[in-house]
């Protein structure tokens, strides 16, 4: 009986501690598929809500989620990886609450700092410009190629990103390798 109880305990413990590869999350401002194994999102969808918002982000920092194993601040220390918002803070800065929701690690990718602060940031500004006159829907597909590196802290570094922007009857697709870009001109990364 003791062996059965111990076996049952070990089975339940293993089952409960198993990390999930694809957890679907829906928040009021974005949806995502998150991998606890990679400790990174695999896909994120959102509609730009505040193209002209101005709520300040002072004092806000990323936070973990109690029900999903995510990356955390240790993954971003002393390296070239920024805490890249998938659903950008500036697209949701109409209120403190919408802005705060963008700071979840569920919405955060290990993104090369020069990409995040360059061409990617300028593409986000372009989304907001479009959203001033039409509905803008965005999907980000995060690529983890066969050579995707895993940090000693546990998170996997994406190898690339596809960003699809839908507005009016148009669709634009951009592809960015997760590295320092050759140019900040985001139009050079348009693939469709």
Placement of each model-derived feature along the sequence:
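Structured catalytic/translocation cores of nucleotide/phosphate-coupled proteins
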Residues: 18-20, 25, 35-36, 104, ...
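Short, His- and charge-rich active-site/binding loops that engage polyanionic ligands
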Residues: 23-82
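Domain-level detector of nuclease and nuclease-like folds
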Residues: 66-192
């Amino acid at each position: 009986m003791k062996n059965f109880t111990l076996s049952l305990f070990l089975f339940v413990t293993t089952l409960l501690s198993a990390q999930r590869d694809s957890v679907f999350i829906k928040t009021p401002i974005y949806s995502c598929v998150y991998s606890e194994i990679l400790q990174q999102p695999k896909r994120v969808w959102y509609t730009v809500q505040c193209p002209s918002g101005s709520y300040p982000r002072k004092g806000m920092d990323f936070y973990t989620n109690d029900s999903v194993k995510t990356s955390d601040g240790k993954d971003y220390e002393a390296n070239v990886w920024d805490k890249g918002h998938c659903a950008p803070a500036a697209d949701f800065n109409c209120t403190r609450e919408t802005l705060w929701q963008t700071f979840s690690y569920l919405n955060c990718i290990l993104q090369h700092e020069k990409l995040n602060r360059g061409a990617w940031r300028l593409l986000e500004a372009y989304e907001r410009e479009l959203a001033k006159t039409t509905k803008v829907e965005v999907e980000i597909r995060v690529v983890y190629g066969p050579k995707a590196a895993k940090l000693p802290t546990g998170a996997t570094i994406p190898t690339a990103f596809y960003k699809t922007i839908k507005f009016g009857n148009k669709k634009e697709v951009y592809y960015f390798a997760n590295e320092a870009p050759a140019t900040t001109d985001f139009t050079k990364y348009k693939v469709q």
